[in-house]
């Protein structure tokens, strides 16, 4: 008897649950139908051609606006970087008073330069007209290849040129001791902030006299006249002006790097 009552109770609960679910489903369906009629009253069909075309049109417009924004932003960024080329000439001279260069032997040939040897260095830097001392060079060369048929070497170089209060320029690339080479200008500070371009390295006397011509882009302003005097014709006999070598006030730039 108890078993029969339990069965009837379970059956009653099950029927009640099913009826509630059915009513909820019908109520939900009625809500959807009402929502659909509201769309129809507004003259909008969720699955009709007008709604689809409007949706596609809106999406297309949004995509076009997005593309236009990034296109114009990219052009603005590119065009905002100055592309005017400015030339700057400097002499790098090793006058034998800076204990430079040093040679760190990491290669496998103890009696000659070979792959892997490191050469840190620092030399004096003068304006192209040799009238003023501007600073120093400082950096590191890694020997990549000894070239006996040309009586020289190939280095991978990374170094900077310091110009006192004006800032500095950094370069990177190959340095060949037996011919002219170009290195990339990788950046700068001070008046050289944003600099890019390349620099031509001309070997005059290895490793004590070098002449550089920078072709600089990206500078916000013209280079100061103090740095851009007419360069002395490069030769193995060039020498800085006496007042520049003696670092007299008239022969140096402001707070020149020493």
From Swiss-Prot:
GO CC field: chloroplast; plant-type vacuole; plasma membrane
Superkingdom per UniProt: Eukaryota
Family matches, as Pfam families: Allene_ox_cyc
Presequence boundaries: 1-56
The reaction(s) this protein catalyses: (9Z,13S,15Z)-12,13-epoxyoctadeca-9,11,15-trienoate = (9S,13S,15Z)-12-oxophyto-10,15-dienoate
One of the GO BP terms on file: response to fungus
UniProt KW Isomerase keyword: yes
Gene3D superfamilies from the UniProt entry: Allene oxide cyclase-like
Induction text: Low local and systemic induction by wounding.
Matching InterPro entries: Allene_ox_cyc (IPR009410), Allene_oxi_cyc_Dirigent (IPR044859), Allene_oxi_cyc_sf (IPR034871)
Enzyme class, broadest EC rank: isomerase
Tissue: Highly expressed in fully developed leaves.
Keywords: Chloroplast, Isomerase, Plastid, Transit peptide
GO molecular function, a single term: allene-oxide cyclase activity
Enzyme Commission identifier(s): 5.3.99.6
Places the protein is found: Plastid, Chloroplast
Miscellaneous remark of the record: The four allene oxide cyclase proteins (AOC1, AOC2, AOC3 and AOC4) are encoded by duplicated genes. They are very similar, and most experiments involving antibodies do not discriminate between the different members.
Annotated function: Involved in the production of 12-oxo-phytodienoic acid (OPDA), a precursor of jasmonic acid.
Annotated family: Belongs to the allene oxide cyclase family.
Protein name per the record: Allene oxide cyclase 3, chloroplastic
Gene giving rise to this polypeptide: AOC3
